[in-house]
Amino acid sequence: MKKTKKIIAISAGFVVVVLLLVFLYLYYNGLSDLYAHTVPTEGQIKVACVGDSITYGHGITNWPKNNYPAVLGSILGNGYHVQNFGQRGTTLQKDTDRPYTKGKPYAQSLEYGADILVFMLGTNDSTTGRWIDAEAFIADYEEIINSYKESNPDIRIILCTPACAFFDGNQNSGKTDFGIRPSIIKEIATRIRSFALAKSYELVDVYDLTQNHPEWFEADNVHPSNDGARAIAQLVADKIKNK
């Protein structure tokens, strides 16, 4: 009887250790959908980074320190409080299976009361079955941007084009991993540039930054690696500091 109990205890302990290791692996590689939110101190400039898995940091090694919003916070320094509101797999367009505006991070980003919004959505909109057309995309784009302006009329808005996506080998399908279509991402980037210009919004051209750097991406050719995340963070930091 004692031997049986000992075996059960050892087995239970082994299961706990395995589950803990799995959790740590997912968390530290940006695969857990958990957040490391902190509370800003008085006087800090609040920066909300809104986006999808590229903002969240999908696949980033040592995710808590190396996702692009975390790196951005390190670059900007103690005078800024940067919060990651990226949600993996979400779209900008509202009439899809996973619109960003239906998720908890969207509501949290509004409640955060940011002084600066860094906005990067559009990659997941490029997939078959989600993409309608550029006009529908921009209509929804303007609607969500306006929701932040309504929440804080004085908010500084910085729009980002989505990162480039790369083909690996056969291009006949027109898609890369996750069903992402590089041709549509290119069109989305063009439309966001035009929208930013027409509406006098500041722009960070992440597409332009990344289009000649496939080495900045993970094996899936969609998500920036640690190097890519750092490059994005530096570009955003330069925009924030050099208004």
Language-model region placement:
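N-terminal secretory targeting modules
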Residues: 1-50, 54-62, 73-78, 112, ...
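Alpha-helical cap/lid subdomain in secreted, periplasmic
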Residues: 5-9, 101-243
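Conserved SGNH/GDSL esterase-like catalytic core that processes O-acyl groups on lipids
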Residues: 45-48, 54-139
